[in-house]
Design a protein with these regions (language model features):
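Class I SAM-dependent methyltransferase SAM/SAH-binding core
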Residues: 12-59, 64
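Conserved Rossmann-like nucleotide-binding pocket used by diverse enzymes
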Residues: 4, 26, 56-58, 77, ...
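Conserved class I S-adenosyl-L-methionine
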Residues: 1-9
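A structural micro-motif
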Residues: 1, 23, 53-55, 101-102, ...
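S-adenosyl-L-methionine-dependent methyltransferase catalytic module, highlighting the catalytic core
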Residues: 63-69, 73, 77-78, 86-196
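Conserved SAM-binding site of S-adenosyl-L-methionine-dependent methyltransferases, i.e.
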Residues: 82
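Long alpha-helical scaffolds
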Residues: 8, 14-17, 22, 91, ...
Length: 196
């Protein structure tokens, strides 16, 4: 089995894939490793040395990823990256092009109470005070985008936190920080699996 970890940063999931028996693992990043972001590649290098790992690395932007540059992988990890992309559908097209079998995608989601596919746009630092957070798709939008770029099957495998917790947190934030109650209960994080 081969694994591509897009947006690997410190490589936690890359090294875990290797530990679990992947014969080839390629970790990629550009935002953190290239100095543009707030992270660096130092943690990845330290872990690779400490683990005596054979995980490969490549500094490459998501939008530059293609078969010619990285190859095709059985499993592609795209964890915590989608909502940072200025062009999310184009990013998913690139991800699809190098996925041999399965994509595992984790992302921030918003507008959970909206039935159709929609995405919330965050100009500035509206989401978590981070100016690199651009989008909050709802689950239907994520599924629709994945199918639009070519994945034949998509499944939500994890969503958190559960509704009672979200309502309690929303009330607490409303009281303490005067944050909009409904905004908080409409946001979450989800994991999707998609197959070619």
């Amino acid at each position: 089995m081969t694994v591509l970890d897009i947006g690997a940063w410190d490589g936690f999931f890359s090294f875990e894939a290797e530990r679990r028996g992947a014969k080839r693992v390629l970790a990629t990043d550009s935002f953190c490793w290239g100095g543009e972001g707030w992270g660096t590649k130092a943690g990845f290098e330290l872990a690779r040395k400490a683990l005596n790992s054979r995980v490969e690395d490549m500094e490459i932007d998501v939008l530059d990823i293609c078969r010619d540059k990285v190859g095709v992988f059985d499993i592609v990890l795209f964890l915590g990256v989608l909502y940072h992309m200025r062009h999310p559908l184009l990013a998913l097209e690139r991800v699809f092009s190098v996925t041999g079998n399965q994509l595992i995608l984790e992302t921030h989601v918003d507008m959970l109470l909206t039935e159709g596919p929609v995405m919330k746009f965050y100009p500035g630092a509206e989401l978590a005070n981070d100016p690199t957070n651009w989008w909050g798709p709802n689950p239907v939008a994520v599924e629709t985008m994945l199918k639009t770029v070519g994945f034949r099957s998509v499944k939500i495998v994890s969503q958190w936190p559960v509704v009672p917790y979200k309502v309690g947190k929303g009330v607490r934030l409303k009281i303490k920080k005067h944050w909009p109650f409904f905004q908080k209960i409409q946001q979450s994080r989800m994991v999707f699996h998609a197959w070619r």
